[in-house]
Curated annotation (Swiss-Prot):
InterPro entries named in the record: Kinase-like_dom_sf (IPR011009), NAF/FISL_domain (IPR018451), NAF_dom (IPR004041), Prot_kinase_dom (IPR000719), Protein_kinase_ATP_BS (IPR017441), Ser/Thr_kinase_AS (IPR008271)
Domain Protein kinase: 46-300
Protein name: CBL-interacting protein kinase 12
Native source organism of the sequence: Oryza sativa subsp. japonica
Region (Disordered): 1-23, 333-380
Listed Pro residues bias regions: 333-348
Residue span of region PPI: 409-438
Cofactors (names): Mg(2+)
Region Activation loop, residue ranges: 186-215
Length: 540
């Protein structure tokens, strides 16, 4: 694993410029170095390209997914070296940490693969380079520095709410993508919720000297959140000044300055900024500013827009980029990306107009969800996976679909005989109770919370499948967020609100049991997918 550790031999940056630490970290190597060549393929899934960086235990390659052509970064770790170097527990910890922190301003871990000799971290490829390379050329404009700092605080706050503390925040570990958005990387030294001592503090002495907090130097235990906030303050000072607040070639003198909080603000710092940076670099962790106080500070609030996102099918989507605002309508319009309903075939009648057909390139929305207006068609859009009849039957014990309202872990499924439009409207009504707003894109209808939280969004996915012309299956899943919060939502809001829509068994006209009718159903219509997205507090 590529890591940066505290070492007395490390040369510190001078006040004239911010310099990179001599030992590249894992994430810093993602974009800094070039060179190398093709490395073949990885387990038949990725084609390796040039080497982006390397360290004692790993190399980082640019790579291409063979099926999707997506560009990724793959960190390749040598198993033998990791074992001999005692790094196995750190590798496992990094994997666990990265799976807990899915955020637009954090480099994503897509998957982890392994062979007999190698471990492969497939990660988001960030094209813009390190933030360090930008600040090393001189101080940034105030609005640019503020935007980076806002994104940094958003990511760090998200990590802290999930019990993750980075402990090595520095410009080398902050990447900037092609859109100018900041990405926090390299969680090799991060601490998880299982690493606290009985006193509730962290005791590992780690980090990079110029960015380490005074309480870490005291070696008496420290609050990981407070230590990260200090590092954020050092980074912000460097962005605005063009040099570090604490600097000296003598490591012990440097530590003394940090310990005592000895720094000076240049004359071009505004009063609001000086007030903020002074509180960020407060040597006393007990009086140091907290994240909520940072967000409420005058300097920080200018132009600040909280990040809102959701996770679907293990992929992260930023609502500000991917979701369109739509006013609620009655009847509910079809999701964008679907064709207008196809008329039923002449040889049969469709009782409720929901039995539309589709071909391989056009997906049709049931008529009960249509306003009659044409929608744009995207032939390249992948068709959602449909459940078959046997999947639906297996939802219920004893193959009985009567009054089905079944829970399986984080999933709830029930059968309804009501029109899909009524189900959608009821979901919208329930969402309003939680102050959610409805948004729609492609096959997704997103319901987004308006209250900002500290532990990320509660994400609930609801899919409606057409089972027969008169029956639908509604499947609700927790995609992300705190499980207890999800259960409260289901028990207090979802179940009571949807109970009257649950199907009651009625005798079939020809005496055939409903379960047998379902078995003979050839296929299910493409589902309408709804996302309930919140930004509730205290979620993990």
């Amino acid at each position: 694993m590529l890591m940066a550790t505290v070492s007395p031999a490390r040369r510190e940056p001078t006040p004239q410029a911010v310099r990179a630490s001599p030992m590249p970290s894992a994430a810093a190597a993602l974009v800094r170095r070039g060179g190398g060549g093709s490395g073949g393929t990885v387990l038949g899934k990725y084609e390796l390209g040039r080497v982006l960086g390397q360290g004692s235990f790993a190399k980082v390659y640019q790579a291409r997914h063979l099926e999707t052509d997506e560009c990724v970064a793959i960190k390749v770790l040598d198993k033998e070296k990791a074992v001999k170097g005692g790094m196995v527990h750190l590798v496992k910890r990094e994997i666990n940490v990265l799976r807990r922190v899915r955020h637009p301003n954090i480099v994503q871990l897509f998957e982890v693969m392994a062979s007999k000799t190698k471990i492969y971290f497939v990660m988001e490829y960030v094209r813009g380079g390190e933030l360090f390379s930008r600040v090393s050329k001189g101080r940034l404009r105030e609005d640019t520095a503020r935007r980076y700092f806002q994104q940094l605080v958003s990511a760090v706050d998200f990590c802290h709410a999930r019990g993750v503390f980075h402990r090595d925040l520095k410009p080398e570990n902050l990447l900037v993508d092609e859109n100018g958005d900041l990405k926090v990387s390299d969680f090799g030294l991060a601490a998880g919720p299982d690493q606290f001592d009985p006193d509730g503090l962290l005791h590992t002495f780690c980090g990079t000297p110029a960015y380490v907090a005074p309480e870490v130097l005291r070696r008496r235990g420290y609050d990981g959140a407070k230590a990260d906030i200090w590092s954020c303050g050092v980074i912000l000072f460097a962005l605005m000044a063009g040099y570090l607040p604490f600097h000296d070639h003598n490591i012990m003198v440097l530590y003394r300055k940090i310990y005592n909080g000895e720094f000076r603000c240049p004359r071009w710092f505004s009063k609001d900024f000086t007030r903020l940076i002074t509180r960020l670099l407060d040597a006393n962790p007990k009086t140091r500013i907290t994240v909520p106080e940072i967000i409420e500070s005058d300097w920080f609030k200018k132009g600040y827009k909280p990040v809102k996102f959701y996770i679907e099918d293990d992929k992260l989507y930023n609502l500000s980029d991917d979701v369109l605002n739509l006013e609620p309508a009655d009847p509910v319009p079809p999701p964008l990306g679907l064709a207008p309903p196809v008329p039923p075939p002449p040889q049969g009648d469709d009782p409720d107009g929901s039995g539309s057909e589709s071909d391989s390139s056009v997906v049709s929305c049931p008529a009960t969800l249509s306003t009659g207006e044409s929608q744009r068609v995207r032939g390249s859009l992948p068709r959602p996976a449909s459940l078959n009849a046997f999947d639906i039957i297996s939802f219920s014990k004893g193959f009985n679909l009567s009054g089905l309202f079944e829970e399986r872990g984080n999933e709830i499924r029930f059968v309804s005989g009501e029109p899909m439009s009524d189900i959608v409207k009821k979901l919208e009504e329930i969402a309003k109770v939680k102050s959610f707003t409805v948004r729609r894109k492609d096959w997704r209808v997103s319901i987004e919370g308006t209250r900002e939280g500290v532990k990320g969004p509660l994400t609930i996915g609801a899919e409606i499948f057409e089972l027969t012309p008169s029956l639908v299956v509604v499947e609700v899943k927790r995609k992300a967020g705190d499980n207890e919060e999800y259960e409260d939502f289901c028990n207090m809001e979802l179940k009571p609100g949807m109970q009257h829509l649950v199907h009651q068994m009625l005798p079939a006209p020809n005496g055939t049991p409903v379960s047998e009718k379902v078995e003979r159903s050839s296929s299910l219509q493409a589902p309408l997918t709804l996302k309930l997205i919140g930004t509730e507090g205290s979620m993990s």
